[in-house]
Amino acid sequence: MIEEKKERKKRRVLQMARFYGAAAFTLITMRLISRAIKVRKYVPSIFQQNYKLPPFSQRNEAMSALTYASAASIGTFSTLIFGFCWALDISTAREFVFKTREFMGVPQALETDTSMDEETSKLTKQLQDLLSSENNK
């Protein structure tokens, strides 16, 4: 019983750390995006023309926008998923699938065998081994 409480507390702390890490990543990314937008703003001085655009590289701007947008979406969705997992005490991918289906109104029993193809089962096993090795550290 005491071991179960320690294990649950350890799991909850790990879930909390993942959520706060994802939230911090999202906030830092949004701050960088805000700063990048402010830097690109063109404010002409009193004798400068206001219709002349400053020189810039379209390729660099596109790469910067793609990087910022990707980081913002990854941060937002990871915060959402880790928060969902923390709130519902989900620690494995299998639990996540069952809770998500239950949340969406598709109840499924834990005993039913969800068959996976060979590649998916290998990938799932690798991910669970990676997560379990993080828990052991």
From Swiss-Prot:
Keywords of this protein's UniProt record, alphabetized? Membrane, Transmembrane, Transmembrane helix
S-S pairs: none
- List cellular component terms (GO): membrane; mitochondrion
Query: In terms of domain of life, where is this protein from?
Result: Eukaryota
Q: Which InterPro entries match?
A: AIM11
Show the stretches that span the lipid bilayer. Answer: 20-37, 66-88
List the residue ranges forming a coiled coil, or say none: none
Q: Where in the cell is it found?
A: Membrane
For membrane topology, the record states:
Multi-pass membrane protein
UniProt lists the family membership as follows: Belongs to the AIM11 family.
State the protein's name: Altered inheritance of mitochondria protein 11
Q: Which organism is it from?
A: Saccharomyces cerevisiae (strain YJM789)
Q: Give me the gene this protein comes from.
A: AIM11
